[in-house]
Amino acid sequence: MGGRHSDRFAGRTVLVTGGGAGIGAATAHRLADEGAAVVILDNEEEGGHRTARQITASGARAAFVLGDVTDEPAWTRAVRTAHDGFGSLDGLVSNAGLMRPGPADALSLSDWEGQLGVNLTGAFLGVRACLEDLRARRGAIVLTSSVHALIGLPARPAYAATKAGLTGLGRQLAVDYGPVVRVNCVLPGPILTRAWEEVAEEDLRLTIEQTVAGRHGHPDEVAAAIAFLLSDDASYVTGTSLVVDGGWSVYKTSV
């Protein structure tokens, strides 16, 4: 946000889901700062429009598509917007996510299915909608998973299952569509997004104490990792998961 990092995405278009806030918004800004045209797909109209307006005000290119990642026609509209507005589609960042905590015996079926739909089925639908273009352009995909795919935390069965599923999906897609399309996952840890605004101050303090870096991460830091995985700098990186958690999962598994 605010200042060109490089031009390594010049002439490319990237579709980012959940780009209205948090990691998605930071990623959209980062890619635009590096020369990409960005299509934002989000079901929150205000946030999606805000990100697109901020990018275009900076002199970069962006478009917003209102829609839910679980809705196939929304994906069709987003891909069409990339074609009509920017002439190509070169990358996909499947970032939209949903977490509704609760242990398995207290989690409703609708909450389970809701998280499965957004976190996993939404990514599948996006990949399917974008693959023809990405194969033609030798593009790249980044799926936003979570350290919850690696470690267990209380009352997160649906979220953990879907995020672990994303890492498996990423590996499989890399095998099925390489060497033409690269597919990787990014696994954020304790990142200061909107979800953390409701966390008690004591819990925030404990999280910092249990993080090797000694602090929470910021959406811009995850966006930098996503930009790397999408870029030609990662041309020999596919089928892997990049953990961006300040060493939190290392600490949790070493004590």
Language model region names:
Residues 132, 174-179, 235:
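Alpha-helical segment proximal to the catalytic Tyr-Lys
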Residues 93, 178-182, 237-239:
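Short, small/polar-rich loop/turn modules that mediate ligand/substrate recognition or access, typified
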Residues 146:
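Residue(s) in the substrate-gating loop at a strand-loop-helix junction
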Residues 103-104, 108-116, 196, 204-207:
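Substrate-binding pocket helix/loop in short-chain dehydrogenase/reductase
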Residues 127, 162, 170:
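Active-site helix of classical SDR
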Residues 211-222:
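A conserved structural motif in NAD(P)-dependent oxidoreductases
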Residues 2-5, 151, 227, 238-255:
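Short C-terminal tail/terminal secondary-structure segment
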